Curated annotation (Swiss-Prot):
ATP binds at residues 46-53. It comes from Methanococcus maripaludis (strain DSM 14266 / JCM 13030 / NBRC 101832 / S2 / LL). Keywords: ATP-binding, DNA replication, Nucleotide-binding. Residues 419-486 are annotated as: Disordered. This is Replication factor C large subunit. GO terms for biological process: DNA replication. One of its GO terms (molecular function) is DNA clamp loader activity. Transmembrane segments: none annotated. It comes from the Archaea.
Amino acid sequence: MEEWVEKYRPKSLNDVAGHNKTKQALIEWIESIIGGQNQKPILLAGPPGSGKTTLAYAIANDYAFDVIELNASDKRNKDVISQVVGTAATSKSLTGRRTLIVLDEVDGLSGNDDRGGVAEIIKVLKTAENPVILTANDVYKPALMTLRNSVNLINVGSVHTNSIPPVLRRIALKEGFEIDEKIIKMIASHSGGDLRAAINDLQSLATGGSIEIEDAKELPDRDSEKSIFDAMRIIMKTTHYDIATSATRDVKEDIGTIEEWISENLPKEYLKYKDLAEGYDYLSKSDVFLGRVYRRQYFGLWRYASALMTAGTALAKEEKYRGFTRYGPPAIFTKLSRTKGSRQKMKDILKKIALKTHTSTKRARNTVDYLTVIFESNAEVSAELVEYYELTKDEIEFLTNKTITKKILSVIAGKKPKVKKETPKKTEKPKEVMPIIPKRPRISEPPKEPLKEVIEETLEKSVEKADTKEEKKKDPKKQATLDSFF
């Protein structure tokens, strides 16, 4: 199947979405060269999918130039550049037309296969008679420092998100299928300004049959994942060792995730059984080294795992596969995200069982299998186990089904004694009781004696006292006895 990116690549600058200032600068540059003026080559710098290569081909088509291109999947060392680019830079094509040389992704020149490539490019640019356009994602790499002095730099920004939907609508119309406007906007928003990625996503959805909103929601966010997609494209398409190993250099994903991506997309790209078998053989060897890294904690083996999974799988094919390939994230990641809720519920059940049985959650998993069988066969025993492990209704349903859950819960409900609710008696409002103040007891008065008797008794006592005093005066030497006191 032909790639829609190539099939619907704009043939003219008028068809290129956005980049008005860049298009005007290219027109002035090419017209001055046609007019006989000497101009430095152009270096278009910008993020992947911004339209750098498309602009180069569009300007060539508008002014009837043939194109010779070298890109990241080609070997670009000193000899190749000298033979291909050097010759084309100073000669006309077989049709008699002038030639535009396009050196794509020059910031990807690295390793032994591209040794001396940058230096040879600078040498060719100095003597080139035909126009040269170079493209780069990261123009500020140290290796391109000397090259920047030999070119005119034009920065190409990302395509605005609002410019992407019209392009997608036009492609859908030409391909003869209808697509919801919401889906088009979702594709555009997920692209992160990468028009090429948006077109690839549209083709991926279209090849899957009917395009649904749910499918569009699963599209990757290109702002964070575009590096891994670029890496997949390079690894699957190239047949050069250094190009393949450098493909994952700037990828933000860890090595284990990259391995999963390669494993998922290998059968999509390698259609020959021999190539596929060779590719998986190298991938399995890479997995062996990764296992040794994790077990021994010796990260020096990491480079062997990386080389086997990238260069090994890239060199496993006999030749490059042409055409469009629908790359996608590993299915295991999608499955894990969908089963996150059920896996969490199982963890909660295992924790409860492990707590009651004094074992680990790993050993508790064996108990779950027995519980499922018991739940389906004996409701009474199941009820006791549910109470013992303190399982909730949702957890029982997770292990069995709703019908069995109802039976177990009904048994539990029947075991519990029904407590009659006593209606509280109406209490009458207590009457107000006045406090009783005890009466103070009366002090009884002594009976009153007659006045005459009192006087007589008083006189007798006074006479007796007087007699006693007289007796004491008469006999002072008389010894005092007790009788005298009475």
